[in-house]
């Protein structure tokens, strides 16, 4: 067991000093049980404490403790190279005056390409092929190391979490069809390149989801002229790939989600919401189809499907960045999220205040479609 030493000096006849040993495991246990704001302050105690707090293993342990708390919906507005993040509580009353928020500016005038939340970490991928991760403990972003240029250019990346070993890994698809990079966070953080054990990647759509230690992503795979749209699964623990037959011949999803602990391809159509749910029946991957009719509220106003909560509620945002009051006046003070429970045939609207009000007003007045670049991430673990 690693130990750190604290020197306690006292006066006696021989001016002796006594060394007291504090087990490192005990320090980790104590600090990880503190509130996030207190943990950040402990970074200044010593270099050792700072190194402990910023490790992925420590982050994983803190996030795991937070799993019992209610998740939130992460809203990300994009204004040029600036990102505005807002954490919206899922189980909230009709109005929520304030939400936790923060901002981030993408370096080199880049644009947001992909964003996902996996076990508390936020993964960002930009148009300049740079990958960032936000540490929920330190509240700061850090850049992932670049791949060696001789291995090829990154096409896209996916963040995953292995709950068995408590490890975060990034899977990077390279433009060279027979190469894939793997980065284990905290393990010297250097890329490993795989060149076998999987089919050639001809195209990756960007749809992806990490569920129970497995990353699922969509693309065109095959050898030579034989290419087909399919879903690739990557087991983060064994680092093995498996090809799963696609339920349809073309990409059908509005979004991907974890539905009752299983991968679901969710589509919003005029008649309602359709789900293709992956069922592991004796390891023979099968798809189950479910359809939920549209709720009556959709007759009055247009809403856009953005995801599914842990409890199976559908998450919608309005096509408009403002609210009309009873007199028909435009109000920018509130942003609305609609939750629809298809099993109970019920719905609720939560109105949030303080969400980029000035930016929404200015951009809307000049015709800038702020809602077009809105990213919504369900089931984010807020620490």
Curated annotation (Swiss-Prot):
Pfam families reported for this sequence: F-box, FBA_3
Taxonomy, superkingdom: Eukaryota
Stretches assigned to the F-box domain: 16-67
SMART domains named among the record's database cross-references: FBOX
CDD domains for the chain: F-box_AtFBW1-like
InterPro entries: F-box-assoc_dom_typ3, F-box-assoc_interact_dom, F-box-like_dom_sf, F-box_dom
Name the UniProt record assigns to this protein: Putative F-box protein At4g09190
Species this protein is from: Arabidopsis thaliana
């Amino acid at each position: 067991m690693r130990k750190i030493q604290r020197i306690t000096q006292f006066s006696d006849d021989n001016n002796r000093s006594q060394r007291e040993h504090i087990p490192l495991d005990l320090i980790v246990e104590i600090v990880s049980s503190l509130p996030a704001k207190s943990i950040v302050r402990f970074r200044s105690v010593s270099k050792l404490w700072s190194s402990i707090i910023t490790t992925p293993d420590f982050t994983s342990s803190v996030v795991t403790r937070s799993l019992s708390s209610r998740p939130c919906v992460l809203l990300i507005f994009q204004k040029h190279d600036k990102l505005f993040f807002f954490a919206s509580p899922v189980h909230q009353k009709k109005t929520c005056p304030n939400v936790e928020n923060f901002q981030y500016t993408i370096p080199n005038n880049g644009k947001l390409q992909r964003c996902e939340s996996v076990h508390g970490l936020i993964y960002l991928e930009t148009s300049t092929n740079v990958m960032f991760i936000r540490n929920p403990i330190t509240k700061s972003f850090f850049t992932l190391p670049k791949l060696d240029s001789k291995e090829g250019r990154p096409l896209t990346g996916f963040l995953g979490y292995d709950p068995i070993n408590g490890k975060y890994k990034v899977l990077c698809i390279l433009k060279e069809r027979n190469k894939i990079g793997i980065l284990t966070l905290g393990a010297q953080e250097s890329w490993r390149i795989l060149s076998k054990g999987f089919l050639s990647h001809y195209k990756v759509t960007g749809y992806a989801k990490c569920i129970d230690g497995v990353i699922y992503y969509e693309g065109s795979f095959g050898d030579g002229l034989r290419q087909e749209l399919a879903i690739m699964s990557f087991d983060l623990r064994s680092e093995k790939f498996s090809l799963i037959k696609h339920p349809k011949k073309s990409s059908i999803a509005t979004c991907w989600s974890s539905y009752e602990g299983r991968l679901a391809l969710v589509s919003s159509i005029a008649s309602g919401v359709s789900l293709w749910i992956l069922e592991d029946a004796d390891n023979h991957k099968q798809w189950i189809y479910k359809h939920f009719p549209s709720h009556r509220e959709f007759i009055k106003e247009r809403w856009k499907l953005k995801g599914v909560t842990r409890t199976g509620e559908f998450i919608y945002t309005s096509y408009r960045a403002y609210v009309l009051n009873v007199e028909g006046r435009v109000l920018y003070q509130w942003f609305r999220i609609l939750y629809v429970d298809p099993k109970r045939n019920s719905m609720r609207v939560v109105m949030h205040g303080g969400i980029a009000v000035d930016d929404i007003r200015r951009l809307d007045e000049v015709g800038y479609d702020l809602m077009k670049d809105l990213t919504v991430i369900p089931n984010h673990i807020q620490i």
